[in-house]
């Protein structure tokens, strides 16, 4: 088994899908949580000067959260059984990532840096919130219908197999649901899916024991 180190801030943010995949697979890894005060000094050492970044066997570096997530999903069996399945998992995951990305961008400063503070006002928060809300209106009904296409939406996006797509549904909506607990009231299948992820035999202990962070 390779050795893995995941580099990211002490927040869920864009790295949580990767942490959830490690948890779902039961694979050990070094969860390196970088303090914001460390980041300036190490930024230029990172590919694309960004995190998250996955390091494999202290030799290979993979930047970009969704590239990391897809790699882990393939390695651990959470990316579908064939190319068509994988394409389905990918488009569902990307749809939820659009929601996550638009949400987090409401808390970016003018230079594009994530502030990790709910109280932060970047001066364009109203415009960015409107964009986030429009993204949700565009994507959530489609995701509800997509889920219903397999077994009436009563299992997972790929039927009886939990994949990265289900984990993305959970983590992308965590913060938005904190802001608006009724967000999924019109999408009962998605709400039930999140509950299934939360009660999964490996996800439940992880979600209960992980660090509590604002984002």
Swiss-Prot record:
Sorted UniProt keywords: Eye lens protein
InterPro entries the record matches: Glutathione-S-Trfase_C-like, Glutathione-S-Trfase_C_sf, Glutathione_S-Trfase_N, GST_C, GST_superfamily, S-crystallin, Thioredoxin-like_sf
Function: S-crystallins are structural components of squids and octopi eye lens. Contains relatively little GST activity (1/1000 of that of mammalian GST enzyme).
Protein name as annotated: S-crystallin 3
GST N-terminal domain location: 2-80
GO molecular function, one term: structural constituent of eye lens
Family assignment from sequence similarity: Belongs to the GST superfamily.
Pfam families membership: GST_C_3, GST_N
Gene3D superfamilies: 1.20.1050.10, Glutaredoxin
Domain of life: Eukaryota
Keyword Cell membrane: no
Every GST C-terminal domain range: 82-215
Claim: Cell division is one of the keywords in the record: no
Gene Ontology biological process terms from the UniProt entry: glutathione metabolic process
SUPFAM superfamilies: GST C-terminal domain-like (SSF47616), Thioredoxin-like (SSF52833)
Tissue specificity remark: Lens.
């Amino acid at each position: 088994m390779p050795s893995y180190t995941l580099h990211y801030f002490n927040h869920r943010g864009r790295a949580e899908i990767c942490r959830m995949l490690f948890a779902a697979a039961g694979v050990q890894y070094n969860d390196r949580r970088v303090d914001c005060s460390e980041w300036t000094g190490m930024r230029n050492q990172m590919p694309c000067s960004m995190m998250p970044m996955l390091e494999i066997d202290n030799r290979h570096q993979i930047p970009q959260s969704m590239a990391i997530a897809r790699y882990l999903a393939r390695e651990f069996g959470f990316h579908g059984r064939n190319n068509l399945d994988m394409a389905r998992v990918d488009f569902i995951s990307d749809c939820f990532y659009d929601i996550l990305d638009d949400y987090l961008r409401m808390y970016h400063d003018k230079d594009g840096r994530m502030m990790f503070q709910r109280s932060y006002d970047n001066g364009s928060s109203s415009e960015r919130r409107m964009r986030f809300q429009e993204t949700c209106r565009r994507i959530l009904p489609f995701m509800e219908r997509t889920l219903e296409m397999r077994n009436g939406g009563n299992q997972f996006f790929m039927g009886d197999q939990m994949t990265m797509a289900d984990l993305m549904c959970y983590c992308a909506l965590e913060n938005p649901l904190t802001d608006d607990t009724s967000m999924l009231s019109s999408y009962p299948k998605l709400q039930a899916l999140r509950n299934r992820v939360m009660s999964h035999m490996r996800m439940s202990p992880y979600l209960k024991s992980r660090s509590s962070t604002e984002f």
